UniProtKB/Swiss-Prot annotation:
Protein source organism: Staphylococcus phage Twort (strain DSM 17442 / HER 48)
Location in or out of the cell: Virion; Host cytoplasm
Family: Belongs to the myoviridae tail sheath protein family.
Protein name according to UniProt: Tail sheath protein
Gene Ontology BP term (one): symbiont genome ejection through host cell envelope, contractile tail mechanism
Keywords: Host cytoplasm, Viral contractile tail ejection system, Viral genome ejection through host cell envelope, Viral penetration into host cytoplasm, Viral tail protein, Viral tail sheath protein, Virion, Virus entry into host cell
Keyword Transport belongs to the record: no
Function: Polymerizes as an extended structure around the baseplate-tail tube complex. During ejection, the sheath shifts to a contracted form, thereby making the inner tail tube protrude through the host cell envelope.
Keyword S-adenosyl-L-methionine: no
Any one of the GO CC terms: host cell cytoplasm
Subunit structure: Homomultimer.
Length: 587
């Protein structure tokens, strides 16, 4: 008797669990989104970050190139009739971003990998407006952008009869942020603006107020968005504004603001050398002392066009376990590791089993290398032997969107198969579904296909008849080839079971867990379950169910439900009995 409990991991807190007995059937059902997860090598993307991509252009902008991007293209294009929906993808290498420290700035690439070393940055003097001009160049993307008139935020002009007028920006010694803007006429304070929050947190608010003062005029710089947080203003002392408009400056604040949405670089202001701290304070207490040392930021100076450096792609780690954990609770269902390493396949098998046992059903599709022998494939299957893992045997060539021919090892073909199965309705089998392969490295004979299929290995066969030639998937077997338990040996039926029991579990928990038994009767729960199964039957997700077999018993604080379901099966065999007879013609 084959039984499976969902979730398998014992739970002591209030919950619902479902026991599935699949001994009465020999294996399928219908429609919902099955999110595909891919992990592999790429030229772009932040390490340890899972990206959700919905189209190829978006994927290319993130991952740039590499096996991961090719796998995404295969998942969406190996059979246009059935393509994956959104894809969750992550690069596996611990890549590093390039950097540049120059002119008082630290420039860090937002692109991770060696390609980021080709980004160039320059900070130049604009002598016409007494400001700075920033250039960012990345020739590989034909990108060049200029940020001009940086540093000038708003001007202040005093037009009154006083002999002297000045403004000052005072900084907090501890935070190194602007704290007060002070206007003076003839050494007398006219007004002081508190800049660390409150009514004058942004420069627009200061300008509005200054223009209400007699004989003062303030104007925002007309170049770009200059409405900065006022705490980012640069320090200034007694700047003469008698009869002339002089700019209040915020060089780094303006650079940071203008480039905040730049997709290539980000900026930090460097501190003065740590060996020469200023404003050292010691606060002694009875049993301890606190030492505070503040370094002023470096002055920002112009510098010539310079390349960033230090970006590296890194290598895939020996173990992918920590990387796989990033896909927890992301909502993925199928996951494909883009590697032929058996140790990683075992880690993926453990990962999907653990997630499924915890109540988040997942499945994996893995593949080997190029032109692997049957014996090696049998060895891979024997090590895996997992009802939640499928193994793809074939490697081959695909024509990609840009016209190039991709030599795809079996683990890349696995991404194409995963894209196909993700695009099918829940419980629909990939058996005999065509795959748009240009050629296979090894075309198996009929006996070999039978042998591989019986051992739980997915294969692709070449079909030629009078009307068409194509490549199609032989069967939807898992690496657990027990024909007596099709829920475990067939991908489609196992998938249908996952979605059916996980949805029923959630609905029962939402509807009944925590309710008082005086308000809940066995007949109510029975009606609820029958209604749910009736809906699934109408949606073609189950074949049928006997309503009289739905039984509910409530004893104490526990409800026990038993039911029988006839699943929708994928037709696997057709037998035709054909008899020829001789016709006698006479006249």
């Amino acid at each position: 008797m084959a039984k499976d409990i969902f979730p398998r991991r014992p739970i002591q807190r209030p919950h619902a669990s479902i026991e599935v007995d699949s001994s009465g059937i020999g294996g399928s059902a219908s429609n919902s989104e099955k999110i595909l997860c891919l992990i592999g090598k790429a030229e772009g993307g932040e390490p340890n970050t899972v990206y959700q991509v919905r189209n190829y252009a978006q994927a290319k902008s993130v991952f740039r190139s590499g096996e991961l991007l090719d796998a995404i293209e295969l998942a969406w294009g190996s059979n246009p009739q059935y393509t994956a929906g959104k894809i969750l993808a992550m690069r596996v290498e611990d890549a590093k971003a390039s950097q540049l420290e120059k002119g008082g700035l630290r420039v860090t690439s937002k692109i991770f990998g060696s390609v980021s070393n080709d980004i160039q940055v320059a900070l130049e003097k604009n002598t016409i407006t007494d400001s700075l001009r920033l250039r960012v160049v990345f020739q590989k993307d034909n990108y060049q952008e200029v940020f001009d008139n940086l540093g000038n935020i708003f001007s202040i002009n005093y037009k009154g009869e006083g002999e002297k007028a000045t403004f000052s920006v005072e900084k907090d010694k501890e935070t190194q942020e602007a704290k007060r803007l002070v206007l003076k006429v003839d050494e007398k304070e006219v007004k002081a603006y508190e800049l660390n929050g409150g009514a004058y947190s942004f420069t627009n608010e200061i300008i509005t107020d200054i223009n209400e003062l007699p004989d003062f005029e303030a104007k925002l710089s007309p170049f770009g968005d200059k409405n900065l947080e006022s705490r980012k203003l640069d320090e200034a002392t007694d700047v003469d504004i008698k009869g002339k408009a002089v700019y209040v400056k915020a060089v780094f604040g303006d650079i940071e603001n203008q480039t905040q949405y730049n997709q290539y670089v980000k900026f930090e202001q460097l501190p003065e050398q740590a060996s020469e701290p200023s404003d050292v304070e010691v606060h002694a207490e009875t049993e301890s002392a606190t030492v505070t040392a503040t370094s002023k930021p470096k002055a920002i100076e112009p510098f010539e066009l310079t390349k960033l450096s230090g970006g590296t792609n890194g290598e895939p780690p020996t173990s992918w376990s920590a990387k796989l954990e990033k896909f927890k609770n992301e909502g993925g269902y199928y996951i494909v590791p883009l590697t032929d390493r058996q140790s990683v396949h075992s880690e993926v098998a453990t990962f999907v089993k653990n997630r499924s046992d915890a109540g988040e059903p997942m499945r994996a599709i893995v593949g080997g290398g190029t032109s692997e022998t049957k014996e090696k494939l049998f060895g891979r299957q024997a090590i895996l032997n997992n009802p939640r893992v499928a193994l793809v045997a074939n490697s081959g060539k695909f024509v990609m969107g840009n016209g190039r021919i991709l030599q795809a090892p079996a683990y890349m073909v696995a991404s194409a198969v995963a894209g196909l199965v993700s695009g099918l309705d829940i419980g629909e089998s990939i058996t005999f579904k065509p795959l748009f392969v240009n050629s296979l490295d090894k075309v198996y004979e009929s006996e070999e296909l039978d042998e591989l299929n019986e051992n739980g290995i997915i294969t692709i066969e070449f079909v030629r008849n009078r009307m068409t030639t194509m490549f199609r998937i032989v069967d939807d077997v898992t690496t657990f080839p027990d024909k007596n338990d099709p829920v475990k040996s067939e991908m489609a039926l196992g998938e249908a079971n996952d979605f059916l029991v996980s949805e029923l579990k959630i609905l029962l928990e939402e509807q009944y867990i925590g309710t008082r038994t005086i308000n809940t009767s066995a007949s109510q729960i029975k009606d609820f379950v029958q209604s749910y199964l009736g809906r699934k039957k109408r949606d073609n997700e189950i074949q049928d169910f006997p309503p009289e077999d739905v039984q509910v018993i409530i004893e104490g604080n526990e409800a026990r439900i038993s039911l029988t379901i006839f699943p929708i099966r994928a037709l696997k065999k057709i037998s035709v009995s054909l008899v020829y007879r001789q016709q006698t013609l006479q006249a």
